[in-house]
């Protein structure tokens, strides 16, 4: 049974409140506290706790930049099959796309994943700008521990299309006078705390990490895992194995609140590192670089292996991409020109490379790029509209990508070849329009030195 009128418990006690049921009453140390880090402390560092107030999410939903300036409403033209959107008017100020620009009369189902505590009873009618209290906590602790089951398509093992987030979960919200928490510990005393094996299963993550819009699979980290060797029973890894490893703590509740010492292996971290975690990104793939003199110049080979990630890299949001930049210097000639090999596309940014503009430089991109069916805009961030996938060069689990570049050779002297693999959260132009300050992250780098006086190769 599920009580639709249940009031979610806050993860943190609101300031000035005498709330005694907040999760933080037992599971929070706080910066001024002593003792081990507890689950709510870790949850505060987790991006899930910020999903309702994430400025990228909010500005993409509203069609504004971070200063609140709004793009003009979308223009439409009539076709034989109905109305079709037009590209933005280049004569008008523009601050990037927005769901509400294209759909002014409804809020969509974005809240089903980003604001689930509010959307659970109104999945198609939750405006993220109007939520408050526990509903603005993103993915609250109480929400996760009320999930009892996930509805998946038996034929595919995936959530049903168009059933994101709360639309694919089954909840157990208690009625007045009772409480209920589902969790991963199987040795708790019988009562309102209940063991759920789902809490340690990747299926728990599926509804918010698989998204289909207009028949196009836009984000699919759960499906990518499901199709990879990581999903194999026995010797595979679950999402939780990587994103909720053991925290090393012996308590998950304060001792004075009844917390018992446990085997640290049974207590998992609630930080859930993801796309903003430097350690995770820098341990996702491997990069190697080789260079050798050739009759026609300097031949450079790169190899990137997705050897440590159980899904594609990058994954989920199609705005994310990796940029491999390969450059050669030396021999008194400054930067050496590329004679043959791939170069980076215009959307990597035109201008000074010191400012993150890499268009035209030797390199490769790893991206799932979408094109709007109506407007032809590509790359597009408005994936709520009908789109098609125009390229997908991301690295699958255990996949190797090899690149080859030929640079002009100097007459003599040392030549240094550098390769840098960057993680970029969104297309550069979009970030400029929205005012997002998201510096590139160096995931991997490598360098090699060639001495053209003796033809000696010195790896760095």
Predicted regions located by residue number:
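Surface-exposed, short loops/turns at beta-strand junctions within beta-sandwich domains
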Residues: 411-413
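Primarily the internal scaffold of c-type cytochrome electron-transfer domains
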Residues: 1-11, 32-90, 97, 123-397, ...
């Amino acid at each position: 049974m599920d009580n639709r009128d249940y009031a979610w418990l806050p993860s943190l006690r609101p300031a000035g409140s005498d709330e005694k049921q907040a999760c933080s009453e037992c599971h929070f140390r706080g910066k001024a506290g002593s003792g081990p880090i507890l689950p709510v402390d870790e949850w505060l560092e987790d991006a899930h706790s910020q999903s309702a107030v994430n400025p990228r999410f909010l500005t993409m939903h509203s069609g504004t930049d971070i200063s609140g300036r709004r793009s003009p409403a979308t223009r439409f033209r009539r076709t034989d099959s109905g109305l079709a959107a037009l590209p933005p008017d280049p004569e008008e100020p523009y601050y990037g796309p927005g769901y509400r620009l294209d759909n002014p009369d409804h809020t969509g189902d974005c809240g089903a994943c980003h604001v689930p505590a509010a959307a659970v009873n109104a999945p198609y009618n939750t405006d993220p700008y109007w939520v408050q209290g526990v509903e603005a906590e993103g993915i609250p602790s109480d929400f996760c521990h009320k999930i009892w089951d996930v509805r998946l398509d038996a034929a595919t093992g995936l959530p049903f299309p168009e059933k994101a987030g709360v639309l694919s979960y089954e909840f157990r919200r208690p009625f007045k006078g009772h409480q209920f928490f589902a969790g991963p510990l199987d040795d708790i005393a019988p009562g309102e705390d209940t063991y759920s094996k789902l809490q340690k299963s990747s299926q728990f993550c599926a509804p918010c990490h698989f998204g289909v819009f207009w028949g196009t699979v836009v984000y699919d980290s759960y499906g990518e895992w499901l199709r990879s060797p990581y999903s194999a029973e026995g010797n595979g890894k679950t999402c939780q194995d990587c994103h909720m490893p053991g925290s090393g703590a012996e308590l998950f509740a304060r001792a004075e609140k009844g917390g018992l010492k446990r085997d640290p292996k049974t207590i998992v971290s609630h930080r859930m590192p993801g796309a903003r975690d430097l350690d995770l990104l820098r341990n996702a793939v491997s990069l190697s670089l080789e260079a050798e003199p050739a009759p026609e110049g300097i031949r450079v080979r790169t190899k990137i292996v997705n050897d440590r990630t159980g899904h594609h890299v990058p994954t989920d949001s199609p705005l994310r991409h990796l940029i491999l930049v390969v450059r050669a210097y030396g021999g008194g000639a400054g930067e050496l020109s590329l004679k043959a090999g791939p170069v980076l596309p215009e959307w990597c940014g035109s201008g000074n490379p010191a400012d993150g503009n890499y268009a035209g430089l030797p390199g490769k991109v790893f991206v799932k790029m979408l094109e709007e069916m109506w407007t032809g805009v590509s790359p597009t961030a408005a994936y709520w509209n009908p789109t098609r996938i125009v390229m997908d060069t991301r690295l699958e689990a255990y996949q190797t990508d090899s690149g080859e570049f030929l640079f002009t050779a100097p007459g003599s002297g040392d030549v240094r070849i550098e390769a840098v693999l960057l993680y970029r959260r969104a297309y550069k132009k979009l970030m400029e329009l929205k005012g997002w300050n998201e510096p590139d992250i160096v995931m991997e780098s490598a360098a090699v030195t060639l001495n053209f006086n003796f033809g000696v190769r010195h790896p760095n």
